[in-house]
Amino acid sequence: MKKQPIPYERSVTFGRFNIPHSGHVELVQMMLDHSEEAHVYVSDGASNNDWDLRVLLLAHLCRSANVDLNRVYFRKAKSPFISVEQTIESSPWQEAVIVLGSDQQDFARSLSNHFDCPVVINRRSNSSTQMRYFMDAEIFREDLTHLYNGDEWAITLAMILRKEERYREESCEASRKTGAVA
């Protein structure tokens, strides 16, 4: 008989979550599979989309996927090191498990070594790059609808976030060109 592992009190992740999608939802669920509470730190750096809109969409997608949001805490942070440190310090047992996506394996190892914490890697099932591609190429609207399970509200909010991101990218490029001319 296989024993279930005793979950950690807390799990922690850090990310931009600029355009939340199903892969992020799977990451949050994996956090809950390994801990009592999931502390999801969403970067509040200036180069990101609006924090409240990102969390609103991520929470909506989690709720739609029946993720237990009573155990999920969305927080702001400037860096992953601060995120992990705050989670560990506030934990009753001064421990946490770090959960990151497969594209962050080297960084996860670094955090693990620094804080002496275990790491769980969430395998990639979707990517922000893929989502941007489907949003930018309108001929893939059907694929985008499928990726958001036909949820028009989620698709609309994701498109707003993508437009915010593109506006920022275009503004930066225009500033670079202006700076190069001057």
Model-derived features: positions:
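Nucleotidyltransferase catalytic core that binds NTPs
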Residues: 1-182
